Amino acid sequence: MLALERRNLILEKLQAEKRVVVSELSQLYDVSEETIRRDLDKLEKEGLAIKSYGGAVINEDVSIDLPFNVRKNQNVTGKQKMAELAAALVKDGDHIFLDASTTAVFVAKALKEKERLTVITNSMEILLELADVSGWNIISTGGVMKEGYLAFLGSKTDESIRSYYVDKVIFSCKALDPEWGIMESQEAFGSTKRAMIGSGRKRILVVDSSKFDQTAFSVAGSMKEVDIIVTDKEPTERWKKHFEKFNVKCLYPV
C-alpha cells in the first residue's frame, strides 16, 4: 500500500470516528508505529488532523478541504438520493453544466439513463465517468488542473464557461449561510461557480444538510441566484422560510 493511500484511509477513519490511535493503526495497516506517526505528522501539516497523545483527532474546521477521494466516500447514501432528485429535473436533450464537486459525480452517474445530453464540466472525474456514454456531447472546460481535486480551474476555465449558455447548472458548494449565501473554501472555486451560475437558465444547488449554517472563504453566489435547492433531508423551518423569501424551491427525500 502506498503512503498516500494509507493516509487517505486514516483520514476516512478520522472522519468516521473523529479520533484514531497509533497502536491500532499500526496493527490495522501492518506498518510500524513510527510510520503511522509520520502519516499523522503529514496530515497535521496539511491541516487535516490534530495530533494528540497516542494518536490524533480530526480537524473539523470547515475551511479545510479534504482530498477528493476522501470526500467522494462521505455521505454516499445522501449523495445518491440527492443525485436522483437532481437528475429527475433534467430532460432529454438538455445542455447542462456540472461542477467539479463530488456530489456532481453522483449526479453524472444518475443521469446516464437520459438521452442526447450535452454536459459541460470542469471535473476530470466526470469526464471519465461519462466517457463511454453514447449519444451525448461531453465538453471539457479546460484550464489548469488543480492538484488533489481532479478539477480544472483558473481564468481559462472561467472564460470557457462564460462562452456557453445552458438549460441547467447543477453545482454544489462548501458552505451555505443565510447572510453570505453560497460559499467556497478557495477563490478559484468561487470564481468558477460564479461563472457557471451566470451562464445558465435554471440554477440547481445540490448540497447536503451538513453545509447549512456554515461559512467559508469565498462567496460564490447569493440565494437569489438559485432556482432549486436539492438536499439530503428536510430543512429546518428557519431555512424553509429563507428559501421561500427568495422563491427557491427545495427538494429532499421523503
Question: What name fits each language-model region?
Answer:
Residues 103:
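Hydrophobic/small residue at the entry helix of a nucleotide-binding pocket
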Residues 2-5, 12, 19-25, 30, ...:
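Conserved phosphate- and dinucleotide-binding cores of soluble alpha/beta proteins
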Residues 2-5, 9-24, 28-29, 34-100, ...:
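HTH-adjacent hinge/linker in prokaryotic transcriptional regulators
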Residues 118-122, 229-232:
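Short, hydrophobic beta-strand segments that form beta-sheet elements in well-ordered domains
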